[in-house]
Regions:
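A ligand-binding cleft/hinge motif common to bilobed small-molecule-binding domains
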Residues: 74, 86-96, 173-202
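Flexible hinge/capping segments at coil-to-helix
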Residues: 114-132, 218-219
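Short beta-strand-to-loop elements that line the ligand-binding cleft
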Residues: 61-68, 151-166, 199
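Periplasmic-binding protein-like
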Residues: 28-30, 106-111, 187-226, 244-255
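Ligand-binding clefts/hinges and TM-proximal coupling segments of bilobed small-molecule sensing domains
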Residues: 61, 138-152, 158, 226-255
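Hydrophobic/proline-rich hinge and linker segments of small-molecule sensing/allosteric domains
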Residues: 22-28, 101-122, 136, 208-211
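Short helices/loops that flank or line small-molecule/ion binding pockets
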Residues: 65, 70-82, 125-126, 161-180, ...
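Extracytoplasmic small-molecule ligand-binding "clamshell" domains
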Residues: 18-97, 134, 156, 221, ...
């Protein structure tokens, strides 16, 4: 997929020379299969592949801005980027901004992760006081009451990849991850070193939102995303990385 992504990036940067770019936000804490970045730019992954295809179909060059999670809201508010994907309104602080939302395009399952020696099923509320691996600036609604009450304690890392690596290294007994990142992480380790989901924390559909600005073809972007979803194009991109079809729940309700 890396060579294909490189070709798409060249297409996006060369075929529309001189035109206004469509600026996409990429979160620096994401891990594969969502995105892999090198020298501040994405080189492969589900999200940049979808974004590049979207920009090409809209007729604009794709431009990527890799940002810290804490900077994403301000970047959208200040017009530094035009489109943000793999997101739900719950994660956006300024919900009163002039934004337009797509239908759900992706399905995310957040899981509590343990090691091969962990119990097969865990109830978070019954765990003794201990740190849990989390990603800096990420919110975890299911676990938040346990964090607030001091029952569990966040141990933040800058990326999802780092969270899982610290779990495997024994820095803590449990961590939080989405299913995609967990499956990708496990592909690089033998069975006795693989991590496993011990509890499902939350499942939800995620989409994209666009700045409602006269200089951006927002409605055309949303129509194109809908077409890409209903035609199976987005699901085919996901399957090329994950090896399995996307859950039908992703397109069932608006975010």
């Amino acid at each position: 997929m890396r060579s294909a992504m490189g070709a798409l990036l060249l297409l996006g940067s060369g075929c529309f020379a001189g035109e206004i770019p469509l600026r996409f936000a990429i979160t620096d804490s994401w891990a594969m299969p969502m995105v892999q970045t090198e020298e501040g730019r994405p080189i492969q992954g589900i999200i940049p592949d979808v974004m590049t295809r979207l920009a090409a179909q809209v007729g604009m060059p794709a431009q990527f801005h890799v940002l810290a999670r804490a900077r994403l809201d301000n970047a959208m508010n200040h017009g530094e980027v035009d489109v943000r994907c793999y997101v739900t309104p719950e994660w956006v602080k300024d919900t009163g901004g002039n934004y337009l939302w797509s239908v759900p395009l992706f399905f995310q399952r957040d899981v509590l992760v343990g090691t091969a020696s962990s119990p097969k099923v865990v109830t978070p509320a019954t765990l003794p006081h201990q740190p849990v691996g989390t990603v800096l600036s990420y919110t975890y609604p299911t676990l938040q009451p346990l964090f607030d009450g001091g029952h569990l304690r966040r141990d933040d890392a800058r990326s999802q990849e780092q969270v899982l690596a610290k779990l495997l290294a024994g820095r803590y007994r449990y961590a939080v991850s989405n299913q995609w990142a967990l499956d990708w992480f496990n592909q690089r380790h033998p069975p006795d070193r693989q991590l496993r989901a011990v509890a499902v924390l939350q499942e939800r559909g995620l989409g994209c939102y666009v700045r409602d600005d006269q200089n951006i073809p927002a409605q055309r972007i949303l129509r194109t995303l809908l077409k890409m979803k209903t035609s199976g194009e987005i699901d085919a991109i996901i399957q090329s990385y994950t090896g399995h079809k996307e859950s039908p729940q992703a397109g069932s309700d608006s975010p």
